């Protein structure tokens, strides 16, 4: 299977700006907001910081050290998870979005903390550019799996037994394994073919989580309440989950 490169999604991408701007409109005065990680969230944090300077009262909980730095730079006060009760909503990005709004995440390596922050929120809002929409999860990339280092060998064996092609993720320099903020490894698993439907994705998720040493996966299935899709012409649309 050929893995296509992920789309631009950078700070200058008009589709990302459109999605982030629409997400900021959802933030009510006094809200406690979960801040995921990644390039789209970085743009959202910048825009949320601008609204705070205009007088919007808001506090945040971040899912990664990178988002902590961005939030502090934007002037967004940060609180501890659980401080003051549940979060009103979490805004995060995704690497792939299926038609049923199932997600594939984890390219940034912060998926465990992203899931924790989302679970502490009343709703999860995902912001993406239109290039992240796929017909089936796994169409554009591998499935990330976070693994405890001591369990690397048996976990790799069991991942291969599922018909996956696992590869330990390296730091950008390529000289050593990437270590998550939880002290674990990321193993990127190539699929023989995309997951044709939600049932297939859920079967894979169950099989992955049953492997000893696997902490979490990049499959976020049924977690998104709203996906905001930005387009290159500057407009954005809401896609809501029917629950």
List the model feature ranges, each with a label.
Residues 1-89:
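N-terminal glycine-/serine-/threonine-rich phosphate-binding loop
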Residues 2-14, 65-243:
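Conserved phosphate- and dinucleotide-binding cores of soluble alpha/beta proteins
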């Amino acid at each position: 299977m050929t893995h296509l490169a992920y789309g631009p999604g950078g700070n200058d991408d008009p589709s990302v700006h459109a999605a982030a701007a629409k997400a900021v409109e959802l933030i009510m005065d006094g809200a406690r907001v979960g801040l995921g990680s990644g390039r789209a969230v970085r743009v959202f944090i910048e825009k949320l910081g601008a609204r705070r300077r205009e007088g919007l009262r808001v506090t945040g909980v971040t899912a990664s050290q990178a988002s902590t730095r961005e939030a502090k730079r934007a002037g967004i006060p940060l609180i501890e998870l659980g401080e003051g009760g549940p979060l009103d909503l979490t805004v995060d990005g995704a690497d792939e979005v299926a038609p049923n709004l199932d997600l594939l995440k984890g390219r940034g390596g912060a998926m465990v903390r992203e899931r924790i922050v989302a679970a502490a929120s009343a709703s999860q809002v995902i912001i993406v550019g239109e290039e992240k929409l796929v017909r089936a999860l796994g169409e554009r990339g591998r499935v990330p799996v976070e693994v405890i280092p001591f369990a690397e060998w048996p976990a790799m064996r069991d991942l291969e037994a599922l018909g996956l092609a696992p590869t330990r993720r390296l730091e950008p320099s390529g000289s050593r394994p990437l270590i998550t903020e939880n002290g674990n490894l990321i193993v990127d698993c190539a699929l023989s073919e995309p997951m044709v439907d939600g049932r297939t994705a859920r079967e894979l998720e169950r099989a992955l989580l049953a492997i000893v040493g696997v902490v979490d996966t990049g499959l976020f299935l049924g977690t998104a309440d709203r996906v905001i899709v930005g387009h290159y012409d500057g407009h954005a649309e809401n896609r809501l989950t029917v629950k």
